[in-house]
């Protein structure tokens, strides 16, 4: 009986690790990283700070695991969308829609704070470079399918958009306009510029439907 009670009171280390990552990731995204302490996370989970430090040695290690979790979820989503989509533009539009939703629900301080953690920031840069290569491969497939122009240097365009997004995360632009509004303007202008007539028609259908859904959800 005691053994059973102990198992209920003390979940496995793996289960505890998952709970910690879930709670920490949600807290970091909602409030920013700097404002959330290890004490806050322990309190939210109802565990001691000592127990938390037994699982994660420090805040940066925990943050890195949180980002790995988010990246794994993103990879799974890409795979699912790719398997169901009928063309590459549909894949990209769904991915951008997910990005918009993620940015909308993320505190801007999260992006500002991440630079204070060198190991985590370095991991993000490496991941960003890998994602860029995959994005360019998508665009090349889109050319073959007739959705994107074949006279565009996608390596340059992708770099420019990436730098625009980096700038967005590190300026006061969002004090005048909402983060979501600026992000949408960048992405939709970008996609319009690289699309063929066929791609542009598909894109405008998506934008119209997306904005109708967003308006309906805000009413």
Name every feature range the model reports, one short phrase each.
Residues 81, 97-101, 110-113, 188-194:
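Helix-loop "lid/cap" segments that line or gate small-molecule binding pockets
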Residues 65, 76-105, 158-161:
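Hydrophobic alpha-helical connector segments
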Residues 1-5, 137, 141, 145, ...:
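C-terminal peripheral helix-coil segments that are non-catalytic and often amphipathic
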Residues 90, 127, 144-160, 174-184:
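All-alpha amphipathic helical-bundle segments outside canonical DNA-binding/catalytic cores
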Residues 101-156:
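Short secondary-structure transition hinges
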Residues 46-56:
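Short hydrophobic/aromatic patch on the recognition helix
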Residues 1-31, 35-47, 61-64:
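Basic, helix-initiating cap at the start of DNA-binding domains
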Residues 16, 59, 66, 70, ...:
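Hydrophobic/aromatic residues within well-ordered alpha-helical segments
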């Amino acid at each position: 009986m005691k053994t059973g009670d102990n198992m209920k009171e003390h979940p496995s280390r793996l289960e505890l690790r998952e709970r910690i990552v879930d709670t920490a990731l949600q807290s970091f995204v909602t409030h920013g990283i700097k404002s959330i302490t290890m004490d806050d996370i322990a309190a939210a989970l109802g565990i001691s700070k000592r127990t938390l430090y037994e699982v994660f040695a420090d805040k940066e290690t925990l943050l890195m695991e949180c980002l790995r979790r988010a990246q794994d979820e993103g990879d799974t989503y890409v795979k699912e969308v790719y398997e169901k989509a009928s063309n590459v533009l549909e894949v990209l539009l769904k991915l951008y829609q997910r990005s918009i939703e993620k940015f909308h629900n993320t505190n801007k301080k999260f992006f500002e704070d991440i630079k204070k953690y060198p190991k985590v920031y370095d991991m993000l840069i490496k991941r960003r470079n890998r994602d860029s290569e995959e994005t360019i491969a998508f665009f090349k497939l889109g050319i073959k399918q007739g959705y994107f122009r074949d006279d565009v240097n996608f390596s340059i365009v992708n770099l420019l958009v990436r730098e625009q997004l980096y700038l967005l995360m590190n300026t006061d632009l969002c004090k005048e306009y909402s983060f979501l509004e600026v992000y949408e303007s960048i992405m939709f202008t970008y996609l319009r510029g690289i699309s063929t007539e066929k791609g542009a028609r598909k894109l405008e259908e998506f934008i119209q439907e997306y904005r109708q859904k967003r308006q309906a959800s805000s009413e």
